Amino acid sequence: MKILHIDSGILGEHSVSRRLTSAIVSQLKADRPDAEITYRDLASERVPHLTGAQIMAPADLEGVDALLAADVRIGRQMLEEFLAADTVVVGAPMYNFSIPSQLKAWIDRLAVAGKTFRYTEAGPEGLAKGKKLIVASTRGGHYSVAPASAMDHQETYLRSVFGFFGITDIEFIRAEGLNLGPDQKQFAIAEAEKTIAEGNVLKLAS
């Protein structure tokens, strides 16, 4: 089993999404001691945003300047890591109703025709079928119910884009209302960690 562990929160040791992804991966690792884990910290690593020059770069990168070539290689490596994974664990805090820009930059590197999707006469087809996606979703407010749910462009986007890649087994471990006071924050984190500790993530990745 290969696990790809992605963090994108910018708050370091204060990040709740990081705390939750760590717990998820630890639970998976305890159940599958032989699991191979690849880790990327998108907040501390350089994750180049997609540019036209990168898209137009020749496959062999001949004649391409060093910085552009490095950016293209980073994107290719990220794609290969994703394709190789059986289970993908993503820490996705909600920032301004959406996801961190560095997480979007990573997803842009995965959205490659012929790799994660293709267009057919019957419409688009996802090529990353069979993977499990577990998302540690953290929010300052409550966005899982109306009327605030209309402003959720975080979980809805992630479900849509990874569904487009062919991944239908998607679960969100959610901690929300984190900015509504210390008691609510503690409660939300405890509930999320309880869900993880009860072994639900193992069922997801079985």
Curated annotation (Swiss-Prot):
Entry binding sites for FMN: 15-17, 94-97, 138-141
InterPro entries in UniProt: Flavodoxin_fold, Flavoprotein-like_sf, FMN-dep_NADH:Q_OxRdtase_AzoR1, NADH:quinone_OxRdtase_FMN_depd
Lineage: superkingdom: Bacteria
Enzyme class: oxidoreductase
GO molecular function (one): FMN binding
Keyword Transport: no
Family statement: Belongs to the azoreductase type 1 family.
Task performed by this protein: Quinone reductase that provides resistance to thiol-specific stress caused by electrophilic quinones. Also exhibits azoreductase activity. Catalyzes the reductive cleavage of the azo bond in aromatic azo compounds to the corresponding amines.
UniProt-listed PANTHER family: FMN-DEPENDENT NADH-AZOREDUCTASE 1, FMN-DEPENDENT NADH:QUINONE OXIDOREDUCTASE
Protein name per the record: FMN-dependent NADH:quinone oxidoreductase
